[in-house]
């Protein structure tokens, strides 16, 4: 919105309309001691060239872009084909909105349809929606969907689910009038995988769903088939959460292992990690009419027009739009359409072979780094289960926070200090590796860890 200052004539006219004679009279309700009686302490304005130099000087103070980062924990830096950046700027794509007159925008609808197809193939489930806000909101919506489908209220959450995702579920559940008592947490086993025996004990006749990470927050890959069997025996649904879908380029899909609903964070597939987003949530479920009617968000379907020409439409729109709020399966407004478009473009450019090759590089580099760290005195890998490209390290000296601060002085972000999330894990560091890390990057981290003095 433009800012146009009021003229003296306009100010006088407004004062007359409210029966006042001056601005002083207008502000009389504000105590004098609370008023600013001097000019603001601001430097004089700059011309454009001077302003650009000033901003460049400020930008130079930011070290983040020059740091070697091994952060993950839900946001990952992969290589994206740069051609998509230019394509996204085309006017027919550059909007976050699903079209208000959707059938007119066949190009946009086709892109969303292709996005749904990609999500369906990655998650291994036939029904995928047009995107969610992010992985956390996708999980929360999946939990609400499971409650509607089963008529039950209880949710069992494995300790391997991202803590922020659990917080989002708590917020959504509170929003529908249910309390935290309907959410039950179960710690992971000693090897880092979901504790099947503990989950089995936690599931009862009021349990709507069980949520497990695949891979989980600690990077661990567990066999979720056993969890699926227990869930289905007791009438509960299994929901899986994937933080980096690149893992599913190598692993069996959640759908093939028995998941009823699978959600994931789509940021790694085509969005650079930034402070606060933007992100995009992936959501897929079983091919069942009851599930289809309860899927949150929008669905794009393929059809033909009266001439027999293929076209795309919003399918079952009255399930989610055009009805009363309390009857809708969700209430997404401005959705992640542009982010979904970016993911679609970049995944199509990468291709299936490129997707698998990048995932193989992630795995190989992470395994190499694990071996090198395990050789260092004072370091160990506390979780014995397989991992993809993220893993937990028990650090020398028992203080991961101190280690991360020391390595930051060397220009290295060593990973996430897990003590910031759970005080019991203050001696553990969560490290993530992607195909963007070179052998020299890995060697630099190992050298930094080796030289750390508690």
UniProtKB/Swiss-Prot annotation:
Lineage: Bacteria, Pseudomonadati, Myxococcota, Polyangia, Polyangiales
Gene of this entry: gcvPA
Catalytic activity entry: N(6)-[(R)-lipoyl]-L-lysyl-[glycine-cleavage complex H protein] + glycine + H(+) = N(6)-[(R)-S(8)-aminomethyldihydrolipoyl]-L-lysyl-[glycine-cleavage complex H protein] + CO2
Gene3D superfamilies linked: Aspartate Aminotransferase, domain 1, Type I PLP-dependent aspartate aminotransferase-like (Major domain)
Subunit structure: The glycine cleavage system is composed of four proteins: P, T, L and H. In this organism, the P 'protein' is a heterodimer of two subunits.
Protein name from the UniProt record: Probable glycine dehydrogenase (decarboxylating) subunit 1
An example Gene Ontology molecular-function term: glycine dehydrogenase (decarboxylating) activity
EC number: 1.4.4.2
HAMAP family per the UniProt record, alphabetical: GcvPA (MF_00712)
Keywords, alphabetical: Oxidoreductase
């Amino acid at each position: 919105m433009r800012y146009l200052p009021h003229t003296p004539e306009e100010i006088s006219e407004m004062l007359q309309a409210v029966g006042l004679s001056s601005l002083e009279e207008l502000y009389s309700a504000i105590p004098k001691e609370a008023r600013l009686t001097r000019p603001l302490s601001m430097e004089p304005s700059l011309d454009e060239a001077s302003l650009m130099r000033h901003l460049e000087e400020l930008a130079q103070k930011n070290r983040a872009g020059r740091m070697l980062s091994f952060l993950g924990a839900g946001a990952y830096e992969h290589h994206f084909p740069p051609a998509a950046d230019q394509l996204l700027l085309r006017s027919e794509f550059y909007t976050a909105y699903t079209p208000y007159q959707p059938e007119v925008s066949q190009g946009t609808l086709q892109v969303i349809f292709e996005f749904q197809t990609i999500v369906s193939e990655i998650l291994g489930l036939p029904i995928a929606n047009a995107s969610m806000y992010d992985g956390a909101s996708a999980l929360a919506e999946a939990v609400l969907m499971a409650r509607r489908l089963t008529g039950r209220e209880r949710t069992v959450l494995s300790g391997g689910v991202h803590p922020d995702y659990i917080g989002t579920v708590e917020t959504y559940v509170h929003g529908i009038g249910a309390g935290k008592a309907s959410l039950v947490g179960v710690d992971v086993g000693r090897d880092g995988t979901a504790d099947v025996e503990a989950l089995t004990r936690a599931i009862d006749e009021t349990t709507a769903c069980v949520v497990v990470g695949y891979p989980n927050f600690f990077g661990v890959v567990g066999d979720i088939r056993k969890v699926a069997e227990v869930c289905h025996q007791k009438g509960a649904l299994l929901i899986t959460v994937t933080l980096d879908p690149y893992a599913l380029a190598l692993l069996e899909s959640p759908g093939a292992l028995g998941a009823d609903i699978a959600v994931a964070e789509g940021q790694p597939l085509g969005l650079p990690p930034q402070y606060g987003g933007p992100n995009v949530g992936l959501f897929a479920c079983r091919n069942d009419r009851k599930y289809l009617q309860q899927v949150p968000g929008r669905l794009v379907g393929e059809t033909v027009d009266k001439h027999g020409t293929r076209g795309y439409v919003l399918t079952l729109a009255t399930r989610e739009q055009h009805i009363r709020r309390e009857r809708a399966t969700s209430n997404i407004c401005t959705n992640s359409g542009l982010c979904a478009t970016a993911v679609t473009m970049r995944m199509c450019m990468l291709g299936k072979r490129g997707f698998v090759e990048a995932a193989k590089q992630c795995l190989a580099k992470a395994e190499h780094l694990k071996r090198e760290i395990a050789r260092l005195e004072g370091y160990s890998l506390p979780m014995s289960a397989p991992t993809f490209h993220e893993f937990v390290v028990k650090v020398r000296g028992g203080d991961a926070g101190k280690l991360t601060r020391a390595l930051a002085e060397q220009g290295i972000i060593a990973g996430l200090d897990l003590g910031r999330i759970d005080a019991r894990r203050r001696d553990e560091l969560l490290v993530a590796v992607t195909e963007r890390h070179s052998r020299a990057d890995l060697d630099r981290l190992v050298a930094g860890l080796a030289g750390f003095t508690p």
